[in-house]
Amino acid sequence: NILIVEGNDPKNNEFFVKAAKASCSQNLKNLILKLEPNSKIEIINPARDDETKTALENIKKYHGIIFTGGAMRLNDMTEEIKKHISFASNCFKHENKILAICWGLQVCSVAAGGKVAPGKKGAHVGIASDIEINEEGKKNLIYKNKKIKFTSPAFNYDEVCEIPPGATLLSSDKVNNVMGLYFTSGNSKIWGLQYHPDYEYWQMINLSSARKDRILKNNVFNNEDEFQNHLNFIKEEEKKLDFENRT
C-alpha cells in the first residue's frame, strides 16, 4: 500500500493535466504501476480535510508515503500550504518511510525544522545538469548502484536553504546545494529529491513552453531565443536519458 500526497491545488492540477497529460499524483501513480503493477495506491490532497483525516486514521496500513512535486511557493504560506506542512508533521509522528519530491522535499523539510527560500543561483527549468552524489550519498540506499554524476528532469524556483536538524546532504548541483537529502523526523525516515525522476523530458518541455511568458517575465532567460535554445538542449538530453540513472 502506497499513499501519494498531491502537491498541487486544483487550478494547477488542470494546468499539469493539460501540459503533462497527468496531475503530479497521477503521473507518479502511473510510474509506480509501471514498475510494480500489483501496487495498491491511494491519492489524497492535503487541502481536503476529510482526506487527510482518513489517511491519518489509517496511516499504519501504508508501506510508504510519497509527497509529489507542485507549483505552489512555500514562502507564500497560504492556508492551503499550511495544511500541506501540517499533514507532513502528522505523518512524522508515525513510523513511515517517506519519499519527498521537489515541492514535497520543501514541505517535509519545513515540517522538520528546515527553511526554504528562492534559489540564490537561479532556477531549474525542465532540467538539472550534472547532479553529483557526495560521499554520504554514495552510502545511502537511494543512490545504490547509481552514476555519481547524472542529469535529470527538474523544475523549481525555490530551494531548501537550511536543512532540518540532523539531516544528511546526499547530492548537489551548480544551481541548488540541496538536490538529495535524508533525514529523520519524529518516527519517520524521509528521503528528499529536488529533481524529478518521476517525469520525462517531453513533459518538462511542455510545462516550460506553457509557462513561457511567466518564465521570461521572471528573467530566468535574457530573451526568447535563449529560452528556445534551452528547450533544444533539453530535447538533446532526452535522447540520452537513462531511466535507471534518473535518481
PLM features: what roles do these ranges have?
Residues 57, 100, 107, 161-162, ...:
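Structural motif
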Residues 62, 70-137:
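Cysteine-nucleophile active-site neighborhood
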Residues 17-20, 79-83, 112-116, 167-168, ...:
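Short, glycine/charged-enriched secondary-structure capping and boundary segments
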Residues 44-47, 119, 155, 172:
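Conserved beta-strand termini and adjacent loop/short-helix elements that scaffold enzyme active sites
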Residues 1-86, 90-94, 218-247:
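N-terminal beta1-alpha1 cap of cysteine-dependent amidohydrolase-like domains
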